Amino acid sequence: MDQGTPHIVLAGGGTAGHVNPLLAVAGAIRDIEPTAQVTVIGTAVGLEKDLVPEAGYELDTIEKVPFPRRPDLYMLRFPAKWKRETAKVRSILETRHADVVAGFGGYASAPVYATAHKMGIPIAIHEQNARAGMANKLGARWADFIGTVYEGTGLKPRAGADVERVGLPLRPAIASLTKRIGDDRAAVRRESAAQLGVDPNRPLVLVTGGSLGAQSLNRAIASSAADLLAHAQIIHLTGRGKISEVRELVTASAGADVLTGIGPESAGQGDYHTAEYLERIDMAFACADLVICRAGAGSVSELAALGLPAIYVPLPIGNGEQRFNAEPVVNAGGGLLVADKDLTPQWVHEHVPDLLADHERLAEFGRKAWEYGIRNAAEIMARHVLQLAEPSK
């Protein structure tokens, strides 16, 4: 073991929402302290199994240990499974000579928090949601530092813990875009527009419901194509398996001639650009004047960091978690919040064209979003993690 090298173990995964911030902080740690040994504990079934090795980090895997939520057979098996996986975590932390553990939520985090606490290893937590998940609620009991994206997450830190709103560590493509648009937003817009086949000199609305799409959002926007196209171009990312219905609704509203795809070959072919998914969504962000989307924590944080006005349509499930994600930036003046049940073609007709025509209001939304957004969250979080590693070097 190199006594002068910080050994940092990051824990979390399952979804991109957990893995992307983890990898952003890992990269920031290496930027600040190139000698740091950074490894990750995750599961063999989450996105981390591919994304972590691809990013150049070693991944140690444990099984998922979700907390039981009802009295059933799993509840009876849970204690033995928890004991087995925490023993595995102890072995990993000993082998990795962990000086500090930083968790990002998800199934892998809870046993890592519990084991690190018993071993006396400092703990840092990052909570990206407005309402914290169960793993981070557990870890908050022992954490030395808690970084959040929102105030009022429901976490209950121990006495003496440091809690700070650090923001969401951004994906590399988005972090790079925040810097580039800060230097010359118009130039970045022109470059991205050429790649997407859109007109850089005409307003653009980006519509996205995520990789799976959002049926209510798709239908309300596509059915309003004629109203919207009078004021702007549209990039509509429909989600997998939903593009045919969107194109049919657009055709019924504005005619088939307005439809085209996304890419340089689409330039001049039509103003309603459709695709199921766009790998380089940062390019669409660079061209957008308004975004209409769900209100996942990642989406809200990225749009705020980029200073993009948005109409947020929270997913109508659970306890309204997505609404809590969007409320702070909307209350700060960075966009609008619309309930899923209220997003109808009539609502779009009555509100969106007027917003697109009111350039000053749209610009003010963008300014307020930029002021609310945090662009250096990965660096802030990384410095706190490295600071916790110092006493154990």
Curated annotation (Swiss-Prot):
GO terms for cellular component: plasma membrane. Gene3D superfamilies: Glycogen Phosphorylase B (3.40.50.2000). PANTHER family: GLYCOSYLTRANSFERASE (PTHR21015:SF22), UDP-N-ACETYLGLUCOSAMINE--N-ACETYLMURAMYL-(PENTAPEPTIDE) PYROPHOSPHORYL-UNDECAPRENOL N-ACETYLGLUCOSAMINE TRANSFERASE 1 (PTHR21015). InterPro entries: GlcNAc_MurG, Glyco_trans_28_C, GlycoTrans_28_N. Its main location: membrane. HAMAP family: MurG. The gene is murG. Signal peptide: none annotated. This is UDP-N-acetylglucosamine--N-acetylmuramyl-(pentapeptide) pyrophosphoryl-undecaprenol N-acetylglucosamine transferase. Cell wall formation. Catalyzes the transfer of a GlcNAc subunit on undecaprenyl-pyrophosphoryl-MurNAc-pentapeptide (lipid intermediate I) to form undecaprenyl-pyrophosphoryl-MurNAc-(pentapeptide)GlcNAc (lipid intermediate II).
